[in-house]
Protein backbone atom coordinates (compact mmCIF):
# COMPACT_ATOMS: atom_id res chain seq x y z
CA UNK A 1 0.00 0.00 0.00
CA UNK A 2 2.91 2.34 0.62
CA UNK A 3 4.01 1.93 -2.98
CA UNK A 4 0.46 2.55 -4.22
CA UNK A 5 0.34 5.77 -2.21
CA UNK A 6 3.77 6.82 -3.44
CA UNK A 7 2.71 6.25 -7.06
CA UNK A 8 -0.49 8.26 -6.61
CA UNK A 9 -2.83 5.29 -6.97
CA UNK A 10 -6.42 6.20 -6.13
CA UNK A 11 -8.15 2.82 -6.43
CA UNK A 12 -6.83 -0.66 -5.65
CA UNK A 13 -8.52 -3.54 -7.49
CA UNK A 14 -8.32 -7.26 -6.78
CA UNK A 15 -9.79 -9.94 -9.02
CA UNK A 16 -10.62 -13.55 -8.44
CA UNK A 17 -12.95 -16.43 -9.12
CA UNK A 18 -16.52 -16.78 -7.88
CA UNK A 19 -16.65 -20.57 -7.80
CA UNK A 20 -20.14 -22.02 -8.05
CA UNK A 21 -19.44 -25.70 -8.72
CA UNK A 22 -21.57 -25.57 -11.87
CA UNK A 23 -21.07 -24.33 -15.41
CA UNK A 24 -23.06 -21.13 -15.96
CA UNK A 25 -24.49 -20.50 -19.39
CA UNK A 26 -24.12 -16.75 -18.88
CA UNK A 27 -21.52 -16.16 -16.15
CA UNK A 28 -21.79 -13.01 -14.08
CA UNK A 29 -19.29 -10.67 -12.47
CA UNK A 30 -19.66 -10.27 -8.72
CA UNK A 31 -18.03 -7.55 -6.70
CA UNK A 32 -17.63 -5.57 -3.53
CA UNK A 33 -16.19 -2.15 -2.80
CA UNK A 34 -14.94 -0.10 0.11
CA UNK A 35 -17.19 2.90 -0.64
CA UNK A 36 -20.84 3.29 -1.54
CA UNK A 37 -19.92 5.43 -4.57
CA UNK A 38 -17.88 2.53 -5.97
CA UNK A 39 -20.68 0.08 -5.22
CA UNK A 40 -23.06 2.20 -7.29
CA UNK A 41 -20.51 2.42 -10.13
CA UNK A 42 -20.13 -1.36 -10.12
CA UNK A 43 -23.91 -1.83 -10.20
CA UNK A 44 -24.12 0.53 -13.20
CA UNK A 45 -21.53 -1.67 -14.93
CA UNK A 46 -23.72 -4.75 -14.39
CA UNK A 47 -21.73 -6.20 -11.49
CA UNK A 48 -23.76 -8.17 -8.95
CA UNK A 49 -22.85 -6.83 -5.53
CA UNK A 50 -21.82 -9.31 -2.86
CA UNK A 51 -23.93 -8.05 0.03
CA UNK A 52 -23.72 -10.98 2.41
CA UNK A 53 -20.87 -13.07 3.69
CA UNK A 54 -17.29 -11.93 3.34
CA UNK A 55 -14.71 -11.60 0.61
CA UNK A 56 -11.87 -13.77 1.87
CA UNK A 57 -8.12 -14.07 1.56
CA UNK A 58 -6.19 -11.38 -0.28
CA UNK A 59 -9.21 -10.44 -2.37
CA UNK A 60 -10.85 -9.05 0.75
CA UNK A 61 -7.76 -8.02 2.67
CA UNK A 62 -6.19 -5.78 0.03
CA UNK A 63 -9.26 -3.59 -0.64
CA UNK A 64 -9.77 -3.38 3.13
CA UNK A 65 -6.18 -2.23 3.65
CA UNK A 66 -6.65 0.28 0.84
CA UNK A 67 -9.58 1.82 2.73
CA UNK A 68 -7.49 2.09 5.90
CA UNK A 69 -4.91 4.04 3.85
CA UNK A 70 -7.61 6.35 2.43
CA UNK A 71 -7.51 4.66 -0.97
CA UNK A 72 -10.55 3.23 -2.72
CA UNK A 73 -10.70 -0.55 -2.87
CA UNK A 74 -12.75 -2.93 -4.93
CA UNK A 75 -12.97 -6.62 -5.69
CA UNK A 76 -14.27 -8.25 -8.87
CA UNK A 77 -14.86 -11.95 -9.32
CA UNK A 78 -15.87 -13.89 -12.41
CA UNK A 79 -18.40 -16.67 -12.03
CA UNK A 80 -16.82 -20.02 -12.84
CA UNK A 81 -17.40 -23.69 -12.11
CA UNK A 82 -13.95 -24.13 -10.63
CA UNK A 83 -13.54 -27.37 -12.61
CA UNK A 84 -11.17 -25.95 -15.21
CA UNK A 85 -9.25 -22.92 -16.40
CA UNK A 86 -11.98 -20.51 -17.41
CA UNK A 87 -11.08 -17.75 -19.88
CA UNK A 88 -14.74 -16.66 -19.89
CA UNK A 89 -14.42 -15.60 -16.25
CA UNK A 90 -11.29 -13.59 -17.03
CA UNK A 91 -12.96 -12.02 -20.05
CA UNK A 92 -16.07 -10.84 -18.21
CA UNK A 93 -13.94 -9.27 -15.47
CA UNK A 94 -11.78 -7.53 -18.07
CA UNK A 95 -14.88 -6.16 -19.81
CA UNK A 96 -15.94 -4.50 -16.55
CA UNK A 97 -12.45 -3.10 -15.95
CA UNK A 98 -12.22 -1.79 -19.52
CA UNK A 99 -15.48 0.13 -19.03
CA UNK A 100 -14.61 1.31 -15.52
CA UNK A 101 -11.11 2.50 -16.35
CA UNK A 102 -11.69 3.62 -19.93
CA UNK A 103 -9.09 1.23 -21.31
CA UNK A 104 -8.76 -0.52 -24.64
CA UNK A 105 -7.58 -4.11 -24.52
CA UNK A 106 -7.31 -6.58 -27.40
CA UNK A 107 -9.17 -9.61 -26.10
CA UNK A 108 -9.14 -11.53 -29.39
CA UNK A 109 -7.00 -14.37 -28.05
CA UNK A 110 -8.99 -14.63 -24.83
CA UNK A 111 -12.27 -14.63 -26.77
CA UNK A 112 -10.92 -17.44 -28.95
CA UNK A 113 -10.00 -19.50 -25.90
CA UNK A 114 -13.44 -18.88 -24.40
CA UNK A 115 -15.14 -20.03 -27.63
CA UNK A 116 -13.00 -23.19 -27.68
CA UNK A 117 -14.10 -24.05 -24.16
CA UNK A 118 -17.75 -23.27 -24.92
CA UNK A 119 -17.59 -25.54 -27.98
CA UNK A 120 -16.00 -28.35 -25.96
CA UNK A 121 -18.62 -27.98 -23.22
CA UNK A 122 -21.44 -28.04 -25.76
CA UNK A 123 -20.03 -31.15 -27.43
CA UNK A 124 -19.69 -32.84 -24.05
CA UNK A 125 -23.24 -31.87 -23.12
CA UNK A 126 -24.59 -33.08 -26.47
CA UNK A 127 -22.73 -36.37 -26.02
CA UNK A 128 -24.12 -36.83 -22.50
CA UNK A 129 -27.71 -36.09 -23.51
CA UNK A 130 -27.47 -38.20 -26.65
CA UNK A 131 -26.21 -41.33 -24.92
CA UNK A 132 -29.19 -41.95 -22.68
CA UNK A 133 -30.19 -45.14 -24.50
CA UNK A 134 -32.13 -47.72 -22.54
CA UNK A 135 -31.83 -47.89 -18.80
CA UNK A 136 -33.17 -51.43 -18.50
CA UNK A 137 -31.48 -53.82 -16.13
CA UNK A 138 -29.47 -56.48 -17.94
CA UNK A 139 -28.14 -58.47 -14.96
Q: Which role does the model predict for each range below?
A:
Residues 10-11:
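Structural motif
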Amino acid sequence: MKLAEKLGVETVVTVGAFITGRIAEHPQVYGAASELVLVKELEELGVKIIDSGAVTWMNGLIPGLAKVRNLKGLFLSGETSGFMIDPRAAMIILRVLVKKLGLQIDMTELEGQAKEIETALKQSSDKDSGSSGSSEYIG
